[in-house]
From Swiss-Prot:
Gene: Foxh1
Intervals of motif SMAD interaction motif (SIM): 363-384
Listed name of the protein: Forkhead box protein H1
Organism encoding this protein: Mus musculus
Keywords carried by this UniProt record: Activator, DNA-binding, Nucleus, Transcription, Transcription regulation
Chain ranges for the short sequence motif Fast/FoxH1 motif 1 (FM1) as given in the UniProt record: 311-315
Organism classification: Eukaryota, Metazoa, Chordata, Craniata, Vertebrata
Subcellular locations according to the entry: Nucleus
Amino acid sequence: MASGWDLASTYTPTTPSPQLALAPAQGYLPCMGPRDNSQLRPPEAESLSKTPKRRKKRYLRHDKPPYTYLAMIALVIQAAPFRRLKLAQIIRQVQAVFPFFRDDYEGWKDSIRHNLSSNRCFHKVPKDPAKPQAKGNFWAVDVSLIPAEALRLQNTALCRRWQNRGTHRAFAKDLSPYVLHGQPYQPPSPPPPPREGFSIKSLLGDPGKESTWPQHPGLPGQSTAAQAGTLSKGEEGMGTGPSSSSETPLWPLCSLPGPTIIEGESSQGEVIRPSPVTPDQGSWPLHLLEDSADSRGVPRRGSRASLWGQLPTSYLPIYTPNVVMPLATLPTTSCPQCPSSASPAYWSVGTESQGSQDLLCDLDSLFQGVPPNKSIYDVWVSHPRDLAAPAPGWLLSWYSM
């Protein structure tokens, strides 16, 4: 159609202006200002661009003296015998007077050198007048050229902390009496050490000192009946015989071969002596298991120590750990019909006699006073089908608690 609208005739392509075409390349955007390149950076680049700040090393072992280096140098020089010191001597004297300078901090030595050369009050005293430029010269101080404020306590962080807390000041307020008038200077006393907590040293103490264990006054043979029967909780199984304070062992278990018994007094007035304990590893003090009787027939129950039920036999001092202790034979007077523990009939290995089952029941009740042996218990548990008789009921109930 001639009269119709021609799309191709009306369409004219447009080309961008040179300014807009070059805008992205030059960092400009249309209708906007310059492009911010920092917003387009990845976060990793920002973290790398920021260098971490180094933490300042702090020296908190001792309080820094609240004095000027001029005052401290003048103090040690005036305290010298000839009122002069070398540089190395000044450094050593400052370290001796003020503990702060004994630490790892070394920068203060440069401050000493700087103050010696920059202050007019310090002057060199040549060691050899013919060689004034030689090293190792002495330094002296002219006290008339020292400013008065340089010898006073400075307004440091330490002084401000003292004022806020109201604590005792360890340093003198003014060094003028010590520098100008030659009074002896007393270094600040170190703070008291902190109170020690619980430690093994507090229990053991110093071997050179006397024992701190409580002593029980009294002569042998005059102890009370309570001491003759049983021991105190802290002294069970340990001897407390009469001895001087200098000979008292600090740790009684280390010097005694085994448990001993306190001497007591029977009801008849007879003094009961402790029975000897054999240090042999293969034997066991049988007198601790049975009640021996004296010649008059009076049982000596006062000499029996209450050791059973306190510790397993493997932990007693006369036996090494996990050593099987031989079972003690029971007294014949307590059970005349009971077979010996060493006989095969007792352990059901040999031929059993008539009524052996009843005897084992009696043994179960009689062995209530015998201490349990953990090593024997372990053997019984690990070998339940052994030929030997099963463990008594009291032993199983002892370790099942």
